[in-house]
Swiss-Prot record:
GO MF terms, alphabetically ordered: magnesium ion binding; manganese ion binding; phosphopentomutase activity
Native organism: Carboxydothermus hydrogenoformans (strain ATCC BAA-161 / DSM 6008 / Z-2901)
Gene of this entry: deoB
Protein name as it appears in the record: Phosphopentomutase
Short name of any one Pfam family annotated for the protein: Metalloenzyme
A GO CC term assigned to this protein in UniProt: cytosol
Length: 388
């Protein structure tokens, strides 16, 4: 293998995990429930790769011969967030979940943050990002106080109007928060959530920035770079791994931007990994319970798949998966604890291979380790099951 393309469809889960009830996620199935809600999917290219063979999905055939390998993966780490999911895909399983704050952050922590930034704050509670700027945006514009909020995930989010707190200042505030959030309060991510507009018509912008914890152990990305391979990150990948284990990265404005950049990078000659995160499924549609928009985003991805597949050379491999669920059909606006799909395609792999239910997302890392001859970590490689 010369190049592996790993695409994470952020939040595109495929059914509740056995412990989903512990997270309040019984009945969640991002793909199948969304398909039912919109009257069935038409995703011809994902169908050809075997998506409908993993789990019954309205509109997708399950009795076809898949072009590659298909299966689903369970999450071993506790949690259901982006950082935990991506780290596990890359071979790092967490023993305990990142801290969450269902009642907001402790007062002493907020006080230290306010002292460090020289301003008071608004909010300090769990909330939907769009709802909290509607609720507190006007007061924020009047006072200049940033809005601090969290969610069911381990996140410390700071929302600010771009004309009230300039982007660079907002990013600086996030770095200050990241420095404070250590030890027992080591949240997975600090997120800058800039917005624009006027009261009653606020809109979040694409200038979001994530400040992740640095991975707590060695990932397959670190191993690849140590052995001289290239690791190209597209989208949120740089933020999720705090910049570690990448030789090049580029952020994206939206899914289409990420897909265009991924296709363009396949014209390049490199040896190693091209790692893309497509966040709109989660950020724009899942959290807002917009099933129709979610389906439109899936159709857009499906339309780009042939462009990606036709750029694959004889010794390239494409892996498509997800990091958690975010079922837009349930009352919750948060992530859901789900299995994730696993679709693998390449000219040098067998067709119609059922990879079954994998115990951990880390099987992806184990497969990359075997392909590139790296020191093996946790997880079971599926390379032997699919190679011709």
């Amino acid at each position: 293998m010369k190049r592996v393309v790993l695409i994470v469809l952020d939040s595109v889960g495929i059914g509740e995990l056995p412990d989903a009830h512990l997270y309040g996620d019984e009945g969640s199935n991002t793909l199948a429930n969304t398909a039912k809600k919109v009257g069935g999917f038409e995703l011809p290219n994902l169908e050809k790769l075997g998506l409908g063979k993993i789990h019954p999905i309205l509109g997708l055939k399950g009795d076809i011969k898949a072009l590659g390998a298909y299966g689903k993966m369970g999450e071993k780490s506790p949690g259901k967030d982006t950082t935990t999911g991506h780290w596990e895909i890359c071979g790092l399983i967490l023993e305990k979940p990142f801290p969450v704050y269902p009642n907001g952050f402790p007062e002493d922590l907020i006080k230290r943050f306010e002292e460090a930034i020289g301003r008071k704050t608004l909010g300090n509670k769990p909330a939907s990002g769009t709802a909290i700027i509607e609720e507190l945006g006007e007061e924020h514009m009047r006072t200049g106080y940033p809005i601090v909020y969290t969610s069911a995930d381990s996140v410390f989010q700071i929302a600010a109007h771009e004309e009230v707190i300039p982007l660079e200042e907002l990013y600086k505030m996030c770095k200050i928060a990241r420095g404070l959030l250590t030890g027992e309060h080591a949240v997975g991510r600090v997120i800058a959530r800039p917005f624009t507009g006027t009261p009653g018509n606020f809109k979040r912008t694409a200038n979001r920035h994530d400040y992740s914890l640095e991975p707590t152990g060695k990932t397959v990305l670190d191993k690849l770079v140590e052995q001289g391979y290239e690791v190209l990150g597209v989208g949120k990948i740089y933020d999720i791994f705090a910049g570690r284990g990448l030789t090049w990265h580029e952020s994206t404005k939206n899914n289409e931007d990420g897909l265009v950049k991924t296709v363009n990078l396949l014209y390049k000659d490199f040896t190693g990994l091209l790692f893309t995160n497509l966040v709109d499924f989660d950020m724009v549609y899942g959290h807002r319970n917009n099933a129709e928009g979610y389906y439109e985003a899936l159709k857009q991805f499906d339309s780009y798949l042939p462009k990606i597949m036709e750029k694959l050379r004889e010794d390239d491999l494409l892996i498509i998966t997800a990091d958690h669920g975010c079922d837009p059909t349930t009352p919750s606006t948060d992530h859901s604890r789900e299995y994730v799909p696993l679709l693998v395609y390449g000219h040098s792999i067998k067709e119609d291979v059922n990879l079954g239910t994998r115990e951990t997302f880390a099987d992806v890392a184990a497969t990359l380790e075997e392909i590139f001859g790296l020191e093996p970590g946790i997880g079971q490689s599926f390379w032997g099951e699919i190679r011709k």
